[in-house]
């Protein structure tokens, strides 16, 4: 895509006011009539209505010409930053031309984006198509990670770990009849946990509607409203079939749910030694304290083996991924080594286009981070100094989770993969707000200490790994019949057996390289997959789960935030 500059003329049209003097004539035929004084009405204030900027194919003005020029500008104080909103009156075209110039400047594959006339799209639809349409070697879309979200909602979720709902994380097996929705896990102290909804429960009815087979729009509307409440205080009646075949009926009321990123921290006794285990669901700021507490426990208990359960972890903050990797590998293996180096598009071989700083590798962060200030502290993190680690993965294991796997392999820590292929996202972005919407567009690719970062089709467990994207390990499906953290749960049990014997369970020992060839990945349906299911048959009506987009958008992405060394 050829880039050049042009000047877009912006004119404000101000209507001229014509002031007329009005003269009144008096008396009949008097020659001494005196004209009345002329009256000049006050000039009304000029209303400066922004005019539409112009689009010219292949020509890109600097994004600074359009940023914060908003069709519906915010006013007042941003509660998260304490600063005034920067918005000014603008137009929808201003917003679209900003994202167009921003994409052309920072998008990793900017030269693969079609330059379509923004006038033909809404603001949201225009952003949706500002991405490559190329495919990976397996035939899947090259860019599956292109999203936007209301800035207030994004800040609420990432900075507070709070979202509205029942506290259930779902496995979407089928969105159209016959539907299947299974409970992955529930958040601690949530309405769902309080109601006793267990892992593996399959939803059967919602507010009296047959969830599995209902196929009228009215019924599906009831399902969507009950299953995905838009606010707290909504009460819904749910019926489940449990793994033992029994039925559970509960009444739950939606509430603000605090996400607990680290769960089920435990130490297991195995013949290979003491094995630490924890379920890690998302790399958000509030996870730092819980991770430190978990590793303090492992260090105190003299753990020699570690299983990190990343099966539902779509990613998040790179800095936190670096900290976790350090806590696994310890100082001797990471001192002076690179956690990850970011590579931007070919316009910026040495400079970060977002921060303006010279590109420098991200180290393995060995201290706590003040995430509010973006500063490293002097408080050293606990570490296990392991040479082998076991990771549990599925197609929902993505981005920053994959960065942990890749970075540890970069310093020769053996990563044994138990589960199914990861999602394949060596890419990331800087969330960028404009006019109340935060945009996520791929801006960089990460490579490890050895320069490897080509796993666009995911990391794949294999009994006979031959390629860089294949890891030693076992192909094991998610086991919903047992609680997470239970030593008999299928994936954790396979990790224990591998640690004890160096071999996979007999029934799961085959390689999953076929997944790469077919392009299949077991995963929670994305919005595009949901759309495909919805369009599969005109006679089938699909539910539309809004929080799958939330998960992909916020929790399932590699997010880079600058971290500086503090003075303390």
Regions found by a protein language model. Name each.
Residues 2-13:
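Bacterial N-terminal signal peptides that target proteins for export
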Residues 4, 157-160, 228-230, 268-269, ...:
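A general structural signal for short secondary-structure junctions and capping/turn motifs
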Residues 13-19:
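Hydrophobic helical h-region of N-terminal Sec-dependent signal peptides
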Residues 14, 95, 487-491:
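Alpha-helical structural motif
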Residues 17, 57-64, 459-466:
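Secretory-pathway extracellular proteins and peptide precursors enriched for disulfide-bonded cysteines
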Residues 20-24:
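C-terminal motif of bacterial Sec signal peptides marking the signal peptidase cleavage site
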Residues 29, 33-36, 41-306, 312-314, ...:
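Flexible, low-complexity junctional segments that flank or bridge functional domains
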Residues 275, 282-305, 314-568:
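C-terminal "post-core" interaction segments
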């Amino acid at each position: 895509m050829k880039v050049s500059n042009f000047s877009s003329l912006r004119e404000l049209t101000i209507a001229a006011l014509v002031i007329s003097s009005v003269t009144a004539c008096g008396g009949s035929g008097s020659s001494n009539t005196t004209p009345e004084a002329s009256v000049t009405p006050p000039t009304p204030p000029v209303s400066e209505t922004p005019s539409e900027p112009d689009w010219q194919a292949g020509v890109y003005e600097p994004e600074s010409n359009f940023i914060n020029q908003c069709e519906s500008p915010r006013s007042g104080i941003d509660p998260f930053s304490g600063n005034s909103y920067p918005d000014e009156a603008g137009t929808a075209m201003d917003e679209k031309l900003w994202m167009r110039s921003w994409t052309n400047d920072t998008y990793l594959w900017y030269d693969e984006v079609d330059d379509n006339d923004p006038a033909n799209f809404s603001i949201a639809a225009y952003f949706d198509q500002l991405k490559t349409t190329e495919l990976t070697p397996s035939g899947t879309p090259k860019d599956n990670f292109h999203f936007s979200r209301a800035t207030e909602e994004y800040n609420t979720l990432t900075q507070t770990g709070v979202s509205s709902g029942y506290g259930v994380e779902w496995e979407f097996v089928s969105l159209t009849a016959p539907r299947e929705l299974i409970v992955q896990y529930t958040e601690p102290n949530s309405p769902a946990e309080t109601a006793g909804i267990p892992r593996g429960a399959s939803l059967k009815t919602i507010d009296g509607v047959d969830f599995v087979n209902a196929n009228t729009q009215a019924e599906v509307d009831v399902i969507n409203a009950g299953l995905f409440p838009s606010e707290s205080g909504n009460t819904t009646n749910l019926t489940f079939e449990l793994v033992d075949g029994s039925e559970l009926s509960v009444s739950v009321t939606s509430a603000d749910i605090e996400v607990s990123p680290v769960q089920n921290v435990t130490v297991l006794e195995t013949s290979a030694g003491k094995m630490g285990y924890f379920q890690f669901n998302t790399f958000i700021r509030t996870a730092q304290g819980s991770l430190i507490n978990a590793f303090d426990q492992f260090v105190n208990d003299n753990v020699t083996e570690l299983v990190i359960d990343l099966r539902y972890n779509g990613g998040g903050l790179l800095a936190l991924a670096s900290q976790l990797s350090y806590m696994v590998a310890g100082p001797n293996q990471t001192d002076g080594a690179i956690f990850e180096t970011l590579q931007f598009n070919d316009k910026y071989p040495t400079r970060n286009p977002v921060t303006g700083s010279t590109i420098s590798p991200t180290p393995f962060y060995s201290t706590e981070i003040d995430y509010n200030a973006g500063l490293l502290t002097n408080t050293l993190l606990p570490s296990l100094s392991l040479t082998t680690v076991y990771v549990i993965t599925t197609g929902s294991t993505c981005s920053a989770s994959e960065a942990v796997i890749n970075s540890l392999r970069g310093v020769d820590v053996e990563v044994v993969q138990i589960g199914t292929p990861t999602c394949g996202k060596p890419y990331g972005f800087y969330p960028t707000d404009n006019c109340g919407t935060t945009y996520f567009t791929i801006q960089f690719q990460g490579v490890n200490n050895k320069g490897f970062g080509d796993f666009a089709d995911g990391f794949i467990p294999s009994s006979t790994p031959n390629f860089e994207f294949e890891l030693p390990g076992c192909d094991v499906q998610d086991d919903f019949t047992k609680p997470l953290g239970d030593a008999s749960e299928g994936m954790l049990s396979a990790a224990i057996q591998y640690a004890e014997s160096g071999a996979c369970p007999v029934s799961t020992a085959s390689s999953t390289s076929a997944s790469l060839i077919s392009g299949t990945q077991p995963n929670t349906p994305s919005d595009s997959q949901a759309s495909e299911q919805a369009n599969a048959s005109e006679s089938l009506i699909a539910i539309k789960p809004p929080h799958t987009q939330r998960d992909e958008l916020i929790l399932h992405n590699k997010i880079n935030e600058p971290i500086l060394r503090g003075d303390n």
